C-alpha cells in the first residue's frame, strides 16, 4: 500500500470518528436543551382539565397528565393560573413555558404556538337549560343571548358559523363556570362549550343542563402548546405522551376524570 492509500484510509477513519463523535454531541446537546423545570400556564376554572378543588389546590385531567409526563422527563413542574385570553402573550414573554389546559389546535394559533401531537379529541356543543325545548338546533339561536368563554374555540366557532350572525348578543366570560351559572339563572339562553367540560359540569348539577344533540361545531384536537423554537421540549413531551398511551397510563387518567377514555387520541401510540 503506497502512502496515498495510507493517507486516504487515515482520513476516512478520522472522518468516521468525527461523525460518531458529532452524533454523540448532538444527542448530548439535545438533552441539555431540556429545562430542569417547566411552568405550565392554565385557566384554573376549566374543570375537569384544570381547576381549583375545595382545598384551593389545582387539580384535573391535564394536571395529572402533565405531572406524569414531567416525572418521566425528570423535570420539576409548576402550574400557574393565567388570563386565558392572554395565553399566547404569556408564552411568548416566557412567563410560562407550556400551555396545557384543553388547548385546541387551530390555524390561527399555529402561527404563534408550536403544538404537540393531539392527545384528545372533543367537540363544541350548544348547551341549554334542561327545561328549554325552544333551542333544538343552531338556527334556533336567532335572537338569543349566547354565552362563550373569552378567546375560546367556542367563541371562534360561533363567530365563524352562520348561526353566530343571527344571535341577539354574545356574552363573553372569563371562564365556563361563570357562563354556566348565568345559563342556570337565565341571563343567557345558551352556552357554546367543549363537550368535555359540558358533560363534567352536568354531572355536578344533574338535571339542570343538557347538550342539544346534533349541534356540534366540528372536531377539536387538544394538544400541548410550546414556544415556536422549543422543538426539543415538544419532541420529548410527544415521546412521553405516546408512551403513556401505549402503557395504559393515559387511559387510567382520562377514565378517572371522564369515566371513559373514548376521547383519548391513540393514533401516535405505537
Give the residues covered by each predicted segment.
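Short helix-initiation/N-cap motifs at beta->coil->alpha
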Residues: 63, 79-91, 133, 170-185
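Ligand-binding cleft/hinge of the Venus flytrap
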Residues: 52, 66-75, 154-173, 202-206
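Extended ligand-binding regions for polar small-molecule ligands
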Residues: 24, 63-72, 132, 139, ...
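Acidic, polar ligand-binding/catalytic clefts
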Residues: 67, 76-140
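A ligand-binding cleft/hinge motif common to bilobed small-molecule-binding domains
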Residues: 103-111, 159-160, 182-185, 189-218
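Extracytoplasmic small-molecule ligand-binding "clamshell" domains
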Residues: 30-102, 236, 247
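Periplasmic-binding protein-like
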Residues: 44, 121-128, 199, 203-238, ...
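Ligand-binding clefts/hinges and TM-proximal coupling segments of bilobed small-molecule sensing domains
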Residues: 25-30, 153-171, 210-213, 242-270
Amino acid at each position: 500500500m503506497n502512502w496515498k492509500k495510507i493517507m486516504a484510509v487515515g482520513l476516512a477513519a478520522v472522518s468516521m470518528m468525527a461523525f460518531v463523535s458529532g452524533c454523540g454531541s448532538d444527542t448530548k446537546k439535545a438533552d441539555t436543551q431540556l429545562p430542569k423545570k417547566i411552568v405550565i400556564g392554565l385557566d384554573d376554572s376549566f374543570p375537569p382539565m384544570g381547576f381549583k378543588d375545595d382545598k384551593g389546590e389545582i387539580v384535573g385531567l391535564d394536571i395529572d397528565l402533565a405531572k406524569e409526563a414531567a416525572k418521566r422527563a425528570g423535570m420539576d413542574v409548576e402550574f400557574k393560573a393565567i388570563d386565558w385570553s392572554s395565553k399566547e402573550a404569556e408564552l411568548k414573554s416566557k412567563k410560562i413555558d407550556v400551555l396545557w389546559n384543553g388547548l385546541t389546535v387551530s390555524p390561527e394559533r399555529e402561527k404563534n404556538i408550536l403544538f404537540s401531537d393531539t392527545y384528545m379529541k372533543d367537540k363544541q356543543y350548544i348547551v341549554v337549560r334542561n327545561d328549554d325545548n325552544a333551542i333544538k338546533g343552531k338556527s334556533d339561536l336567532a335572537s338569543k343571548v349566547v354565552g362563550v368563554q373569552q378567546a375560546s374555540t367556542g367563541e371562534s366557532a360561533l363567530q365563524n358559523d352562520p348561526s353566530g350572525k343571527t344571535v341577539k348578543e354574545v356574552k363573553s366570560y372569563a371562564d365556563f363556570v361563570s357562563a354556566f351559572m348565568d345559563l342556570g339563572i337565565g341571563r343567557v339562553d345558551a352556552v357554546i362549550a367543549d363537550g368535555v367540560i359540558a358533560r363534567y359540569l352536568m354531572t355536578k348539577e344533574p338535571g339542570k343542563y343538557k347538550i342539544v344533540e346534533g349541534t356540534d361545531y366540528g372536531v377539536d384536537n387538544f394538544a400541548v402548546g410550546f414556544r415556536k423554537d422549543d422543538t426539543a421540549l415538544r419532541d420529548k413531551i410527544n415521546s412521553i405522551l405516546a408512551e403513556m398511551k401505549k402503557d395504559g397510563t393515559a387511559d387510567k387518567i382520562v377514565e378517572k376524570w371522564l369515566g371513559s377514555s373514548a376521547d383519548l387520541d391513540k393514533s401516535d401510540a405505537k
